[in-house]
A protein has these predicted regions:
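Alpha-helical tetratricopeptide repeat
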Residues: 3-136
């Protein structure tokens, strides 16, 4: 009985990993709606994983759903605040909504995590220009 339960548990883990991989493949081939469907299935099973939240945020961004992308990226950040790409995605989603001050805050955090990425610095400067904060 114990052996059967361990096989079922291992199989469930494999299926979630497979769903994430399938969603990322669909994302790679620009099939954003299909990728969202895969990530929705993963999130229904394991909402505590940060990666499907991030991947779904990417898909929503490419579908011009910037509010949904920001929301999913926020959830991914809540689950794992150490990935600078999530802050970048949320900042870009906020820029598209003209939430420049929030985007600056995201870029501040991304720069703290990885100061060698020049696009973080440039995008933060562009946000500050839009806010007319020329002294910073």
């Amino acid at each position: 009985m114990v052996a059967l339960l361990s096989v079922v548990k291992a199989n469930a883990q494999y299926n979630v990993d497979r769903l994430i991989m399938n969603g990322e493949v669909a994302l790679h081939y620009d099939d954003y709606v299909l990728s969202i469907q895969y990530f929705n299935k993963v999130l229904a099973l394991k909402p505590y994983l940060w990666l499907p939240w991030y991947d779904r945020a990417v898909a929503k961004f490419y579908l011009d759903d910037y509010i949904g992308s920001e929301s999913d990226a926020t959830k991914a950040i809540d689950l794992n605040p150490y990935i600078e790409q999530i802050f970048d995605l949320r900042a870009i989603s906020r820029i598209r909504q003209e939430k420049y001050q929030d985007a600056v805050s995201d870029y501040d955090r991304a720069i703290r995590l990885n100061p060698s990425v020049s696009s973080f610095w440039v995008n933060r400067a562009i946000c500050r220009m839009n806010l007319q904060e020329f002294d910073q």
